[in-house]
Amino acid sequence: MGATVGVYFCHCGGIITEKIDPEVVRAAVLRLPEVAYFTPISLLCSEDGLGELTRDILARAPERVVIAACSPREHERTFKRALAGTTVNPYLMQMVNIREQVAWVVDDPAAAAEKAVAGIRSAVRRVARNLPLRNIEIETHEETLVIGAGPAGMQAALTLAVAGRPVVLVEKAPMIGGLPVRYEAVAPNMECGPCMLEPMMDQLLHGDAARHIELLTMAEVTAVKGFLGNFEVTIRQAPRFVDASACIGCSMCADACPARAPHPYNCGFDTRPAIAMPFLGALPNLPYLDPATCLRTTGEDCRLCEQACPVPGTIRLDDREKVIERTVGSVIVATGAGLYDCGVFPQLGHGRVPGVYSSLEFERLSSPSGPTAGQIVAPGDKAPERVAIVHCVGSLDAAHQDYCSGVCCQVAFKFNHLVRHRCPEAHITHFHRELTMPGKEAGRLLAHNLEDERNTFVRYERLDDLRISDAPGARRVEIMGGATVRGGEFDLVLLCPAMTPGADTKAIGAMLDVATDRWGFFEELHTRMSPTSSKVAGIHLAGTCHGPKDIPQSIADGLAASASILASITPGKKMELEPIRASVLEGRCSGCRVCLSVCPYRAISFDEAAQSASISQVICQGCGTCVAACPSGVIAGAHFTSEQIYAEIGGILA
């Protein structure tokens, strides 16, 4: 190879040349056989500097370029864009960091110049082996699949729809809104949950952007295949047995239905007809029929609901499951979370001792749309005079959930508010490990509860020390430990469990090939820098599916995930991806599958017929993990080949 490399030395406005003499560097660099010329420029990243760079390259026509300047993290993309307007392929340029790694850390000018020359020599040897790569262009679909219609999913869908993007919003329940629409109040300001979310739900169902949203309730995503910009999605939608376009929401079908079953949205405290609204105020305002409860399932030819309906043809007893297929460019997972099973702690009496309720059970018992129409009653239908609220059920416990959910204490104090509002004379005891009230507004809620003279706070060390037993006409709560036993008798005991991964998180993760963390939540690409991105390109996370959080944080997640999609996919425009990707050398794979287990982006698949691995050039992020792991050495990393790296090392050591 002749002298075909042009070297550009940035003064960085004097910051670099204060320590490194460019003339000393010039003399040494021009002795390298590959270097055609050496050009210093005062401030290469400035508009004038970039103009001088492009003009000089067009005039001198080098085959390759080395730029000695600042960190590639700061301006490599700047210089690549500049080279795109010249005769030099942007990937035939190599940067050398002589500012952060030399001028800022080496005090002796002679040593600094020597180190700068070594870096440039290394880059010259490497760039001689670079290949003229081209960016990968892919067709993309602008549609987005949003899985889950809780606060995060609804916000994500609305943000995209307002921008004119089509959205497929899939919700497995017959209504939207997630858990908060079943809450009487939302901490810390005690807003009505359904009232707070109603404007968002109304906009999603009936607003100007609703035409861009295909809402599929009672539906589940069963398969997702493909990659960023091109996901093939299969959705199964259970029959509602009600024509949504004709139903007027009068509930006359429910009044006529003779069948009854435990109410799934009231925690089984009461019953509901086979056909009914999920609960009062649920949206969409549509009933649904549960085939497992309907008398027709047992062979009876019951048509009372159909006969009672004032709009003929609205009840569709012949409705069947639908299989729906869509192609989307991105996916947002907003499937929500669950609550730790209080039954795991037999000593707490949940499900065994009357009057001991989990937080979700009490949410329904205190809701006007719940089984008691919002009246708070203890066993025996009496108003409670003494109430125990147990914090941290399953939280901060290495044997269960070792984290703090950050919202349970607010829930506990919300319950305090509800009880105090409806039973003003009740005495309330909080059994707690820690009191965690993050955020700007939650502190006022804590202070209000601490100031209440009818509230008592008792700290316990371990949940195993608590015992809840059935005393005559009451529930006895005791803290066992040491020589003393503390506690008392209560009419109601409310358990506030940890927030946990949703029951279907593992199955959805396997379907999407999205990893879960050690707690079972979906794992982010980076918990701080990319908190709503999964490790699979094009699949985003929002809300409590990737960790405990409150409603404002969930809505912020929905906004962030949708904004990321709006920024990455432009309708009618191909997506450009850097070509720095790994690939398997054809015909040389041994079929060991080591690469599949180490790829953090799930970019590698295995062809059973060919007994060979292959790497998706769209999903791969060029991290090089598989290149290093391949025992046969048959995976090559574009722009970071072994030959290039060895040449770079050799240049340093020469």
Regions found by a protein language model. Give the residues of each.
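Residues forming the flavin
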Residues: 1-654
